[in-house]
Amino acid sequence: MEPKRSRLVVCAPEPSHAREFPDVAVFSGGRANASQAERLARAVGRVLADRGVTGGARVRLTMANCADGPTLVQINLQVGDTPLRAQAATAGIDDLRPALIRLDRQIVRASAQWCPRPWPDRPRRRLTTPAEALVTRRKPVVLRRATPLQAIAAMDAMDYDVHLFTDAETGEDAVVYRAGPSGLRLARQHHVFPPGWSRCRAPAGPPVPLIVNSRPTPVLTEAAAVDRAREHGLPFLFFTDQATGRGQLLYSRYDGNLGLITPTGDGVADGLA
């Protein structure tokens, strides 16, 4: 008999604040009591104060059905002009340390000269797609036009493991993601050659090798993409949608289901995502 998995529930936002740090808002949908929410807001506020970060933060909790089950903590803030996010799975609402450590590390990295996040990311559990997973969240986005290195910097700032963007060199939809011996890979829809900067002899190259996928992205329907992700237990799947010709990103969620990121319209915005 297979062990029963804890089911995570996304709660509607109902912000709580700590009197000491009123600009730190905690959204738990009422699942966290007032003292728990205030304790979390105070802990996050102290990290921000210690690092000299102003402007507050938004903390979102995704909690299990059972009172003592796992909790996903997501913290969004801004450091200077850079949007920042830290996300950590914890043992429960009273287990704040993993989220606070990750938040502190994200702030330190954002305040220094950029370099890729350490790889492998041992504190983070690698997600896979269960056989019964369904698409439960759809995120239409305007993709940003960026170089692969700019996309990697945005991915690291937002604490993602994969990031969908429009490649500035080819105009194709593409993803950068964490995998392989170097920790960084690039997949474009059609072109499989390395980015232009890697083919020149400039004295300053990228900080780490970027491995480019040697095969074009598969052309699939959404249903076929879901089937492939389930069959192989993939953490995510980048594919070209058969109907629109645009790159789409199917990704595994902590609740055991899938999210789907789809580009909106035909245009792209300049800059980082």
From Swiss-Prot:
This protein's UniProt keywords: Virulence
Induction pattern: A member of the dormancy regulon. Induced in response to reduced oxygen tension (hypoxia), low levels of nitric oxide (NO) and carbon monoxide (CO). It is hoped that this regulon will give insight into the latent, or dormant phase of infection.
Swiss-Prot/TrEMBL GO biological process terms: negative regulation of translational elongation
InterPro entries assigned to the protein according to its UniProt record, in alphabetical order: HPF/YfiA_ribosome-assoc, Ribosom_S30AE_C, Ribosom_S30AE_C_sf
MF (Gene Ontology): ribosomal small subunit binding
Domain of life of the native organism: Bacteria
GO CC terms, sorted: cytosolic small ribosomal subunit; peptidoglycan-based cell wall; plasma membrane
Assembly and binders: Interacts with human TLR2. Monomer in solution. In vitro, binds to E.coli ribosomes.
Role according to the record: Involved in translation regulation. Inhibits protein synthesis and decreases bacterial growth when expressed in E.coli. Can also stimulate macrophages and peripheral blood mononuclear cells (PBMC) to secrete important cytokines that may be significant in granuloma formation and its maintenance. Increases secretion of IFN-gamma, TNF-alpha, IL-1 beta and IL-8 through human Toll-like receptor 2 (TLR2) signaling pathway.
Protein name: Dormancy associated translation inhibitor
